[in-house]
Every structure is written in structure tokens, then in C-alpha cells.
């Protein structure tokens, strides 16, 4: 079920402060965040966030198409190594 419209998008408070500070500075550096649950807002467009996936921070450059999505969607937490090979097929 989607979030109620009257509540508005969820964003952690510290994330807004970090984004404002990054907008004010001239240096473009990766903003490290742990909040995968926060919604991407229009004021984040053009910034690069390091979204934590449980092991490391994955750099995510925010574009117009990402607005309204969550940060966690762009930082996968699981790695797929493929299914086990069929032993019968290898013998031939």
C-alpha cells in the first residue's frame, strides 16, 4: 500500500541538512547516507549520494527521473552469483 498523500514524502531530517550544506558549498563530494528509506526530492537533483548497502557506500548521482523513488532502490544489497551448474551437462 502506498504512502498517504496528506502525509507527504518521508525524508530523514539529517539528510535535508546535509543536502543544503552540499548545495551551498562549491565542492562536489559524495554525501554519505545510511537512510535507504528516504524519498528522493527535487532539491537533491544534481547531487551525488553514497548510499550504504550493508558493506560499502555506493555512489548514486541523482537525476530528474529518480525523484519520488527511494534511495535504497539504487543500491542493491544482494549479489547474484548465478545458479549452480548442472553436473550432468558438464560430463559430456
From Swiss-Prot:
Recorded family membership: Belongs to the universal ribosomal protein uS19 family.
Cited Pfam families: Ribosomal_S19
Record keywords, A-Z: Ribonucleoprotein, Ribosomal protein, RNA-binding, rRNA-binding
Source organism superkingdom: Bacteria
Function: Protein S19 forms a complex with S13 that binds strongly to the 16S ribosomal RNA.
Cellular component terms (Gene Ontology): cytoplasm; small ribosomal subunit
Gene from which this protein is expressed: rpsS
Originating species: Methylobacterium nodulans (strain LMG 21967 / CNCM I-2342 / ORS 2060)
InterPro entries, A to Z: Ribosomal_uS19, Ribosomal_uS19_bac-type, Ribosomal_uS19_CS, Ribosomal_uS19_SF
Signal peptide (from-to): none
Keyword Ribosomal protein: yes
This protein's record includes keyword rRNA-binding: yes
PANTHER family with a match to the protein in the record: RIBOSOMAL PROTEIN S19P FAMILY MEMBER, SMALL RIBOSOMAL SUBUNIT PROTEIN US19M
SUPFAM superfamilies: Ribosomal protein S19
The name this protein goes by in its record: Small ribosomal subunit protein uS19
GO biological process: ribosomal small subunit assembly; translation
GO molecular function, one term: rRNA binding
